[in-house]
Structure formats: C-alpha cells, structure tokens
Amino acid sequence: MKFLDQVKIYVRSGNGGAGAVSFRREKYIEYGGPDGGDGGRGGDVWIEAVEGLNTLIDYRYQQHFKAGTGVHGMGRNRHGAAGEDVVLKVPVGTEVLDEDKNLIVDMDEAGKRYLLAKGGNGGFGNTHFKGPVNQAPRHANPGLPGEERAIWLRLKLIADVGLVGLPNAGKSTFLAAASAAKPKIADYPFTTLAPNLGVVDLSVGERFVLADIPGLIEGAHEGAGIGTRFLGHIERTAVLIHLVDGTQEDIVGAWRTVRHELEAYGADLADKPEILALNKIDALDEETRAEKQAQLAEAAGMDVRLVSGFTGENVTELLREAFALVRERKRAAAEEAAGPSEGWTP
C-alpha cells in the first residue's frame, strides 16, 4: 500500500429539509387547520481515528465529502428524516488542521471522534405559525444550509522509538533485523522514501514499535532533500536511535549534521533521549571499530554503541536498552498525568 501522510480535503454537511405547508383534509372536518411537518436535520460530517490504518492514501482519490440533505416535512405533521452522516476514518495519530495549517484536533486515540461540520436544522412546518390571528398560515421555513470547510489531514505515526541518521546509514537494514518489517533495502541514498514501522518483540512483555524515516541531509529543515516532512513521524516517539555509518570517513560530521537538523526542526526532537550507535561494524576491523567509537564518543559527549544491522551483532542489546528507556518515559508520563499523590492524614 502506498504511503500518504498529508492531504487537503473539503467537507460539507447536509442542508436541513424544508418545512411543509399542509392542511388537515378529512371527511366531516371542515376547518382542519395546518398540519405541515418539520424538515429533517442535515447530516453531519465526522472524523474518527481507527486502528489498522497507517496511511491517508484513500483521500488521494476522493477529496470532497458531503453529508446527506434532510428530507422535507410532510402533511399530517410528519417530520422529515435526518440526512445521512458522513464519517471519515483516519489512522490514529492524524492531525486535523484548518486551511491556514492551524491545529483543530489531534486524533491521537483509537475511537476518538470529532465533529467537522454540523448539519443544518430542518425548517418549521406551517403548524408552528398558527395563531389566533392567522389560523391557516400558508408559509413554512426552508431548512438551514450546512457548513462547508477545507481542512488538512496530516499523519504523524505513533511509534515508541524512532530511527534517525543520514541517507544510507543502514536504518532500513537495522529495522529489518529488529522486527518482521520488510522495508526496501539497497546500497544507495534515499532508498527509503516513506516511513516504515516495525514491531519489535524481545520477549513476553517487551514489545515496542520502531519507526524508520527517510534519511536527513544538511539543510533538510529548509526543505533540502526530502526535507523535514517526515520528521513529524518521530515527534511522538519516546526515544531516538541515531545510527551513524561506520564505514564513512567523517563520522563526527555525519552525527553533527543530523543533530543540527533535529534542533532546527524543533518540537523538542533534540531533547529526546538518544542512543548513539556506530552501524555497519561488520565491515570494520577491531582496531578501526575502537578508534571510531572513541572519536565519536568524544565529539558527542556520550556513549557510543557498536552494532551491525546486516549481521545482527549487538542489535538485541541495543533494542533492550531502547525498551528500558521507553518504559521509563511511559512511567514518568503516567505519574505526571496522575499528579502529586496526597499523603493520607487521620
């Protein structure tokens, strides 16, 4: 299935049905009076987050959505039926923005629903206008028009851990080694053109979602290369795994480039817990491994792990470390949401 993470759509709720002008006509009843029913309410347009989706591709082929019009009222005080609602189903993690890209709602939980456009009310039938002066009103209200708006849908995948690095740093190979995902893998930059998700199963109770995004290059925050469009997919992650290609000459420069792009993008990406790893060590001898590990650790001011996505060397250990950080972050978030505990006093 093709990946699409941003699309503009147009929604319109249904118009309300018109009220009816009708009079009671029955045998032996000379002056039956008005009995026009009200029009039905126009249909609403809703958006709902559902599990099992990870792309907005369905909205590439249809961008206009209109709810049903309310049915007009009828005689004998029969009200019209309401128009049919439209429910737009989107992946969990989809943001809804107005035409100016201001956030309307974040569909961050499965089952969450939000009203995008409310249907117009139905018009009153002539029964409502009967009075002591006018006992046979010959007019009714038309239904109110529905609402119309243009909105943007922007998907930010929900993953626990994000993989970052320059193009060809071996992120897709690492994802394939860590999970059952089957991303496209080739020995050239920008092989990955869309985010990939994989579920990492370390053991019972040790499971998390790993996201691989297209590689960053210098100036990505200004739109260079693929730009930072896909960085939004790691905004929700708890931990970053930063892979540096150990076979290249300037490993420190590679690390600095990615760090700069994370800081320039904002959204606190640069402040997330980060595991720095030198990848492709299967192509290095022991002496070169140690030399490059020390060089990168000194520049970054943090420990550097040695891994090989190709052979799987040290991959499990790195994933367990990432899971421990994810668990710690989730525990801290839960405690913060619960608020300070009040001590019991007699």
Curated annotation (Swiss-Prot):
GO terms for biological process: ribosome biogenesis. GO terms for cellular component: cytoplasm. Its EC number is 3.6.5.-. Its cofactor is Mg(2+). Residues 1-158 form the Obg domain. Mg(2+) binds at residues 172, 192. GTP binds at residues 165-172, 190-194, 212-215, 279-282, 308-310. Residues 159-327 form the OBG-type G domain. It holds the Pfam family MMR_HSR1. Its main location: cytoplasm. It is found in: Cytoplasm. GO terms for molecular function: GTP binding; GTPase activity; magnesium ion binding. It comes from the Bacteria. Keywords: Cytoplasm, GTP-binding, Hydrolase, Magnesium, Metal-binding, Nucleotide-binding. InterPro entries: G_OBG (IPR031167), GTP-bd (IPR006073), GTP-bd_Obg/CgtA (IPR014100), GTP1-OBG_CS (IPR006074), GTP1_OBG_dom (IPR006169), GTP1_OBG_dom_sf (IPR036726), OBG_GTPase (IPR045086), P-loop_NTPase (IPR027417). Gene3D superfamilies: GTP1/OBG domain, P-loop containing nucleotide triphosphate hydrolases. PROSITE patterns: G_OBG, GTP1_OBG, OBG. Belongs to the TRAFAC class OBG-HflX-like GTPase superfamily. OBG GTPase family. An essential GTPase which binds GTP, GDP and possibly (p)ppGpp with moderate affinity, with high nucleotide exchange rates and a fairly low GTP hydrolysis rate. Plays a role in control of the cell cycle, stress response, ribosome biogenesis and in those bacteria that undergo differentiation, in morphogenesis control. Monomer. This is GTPase Obg.
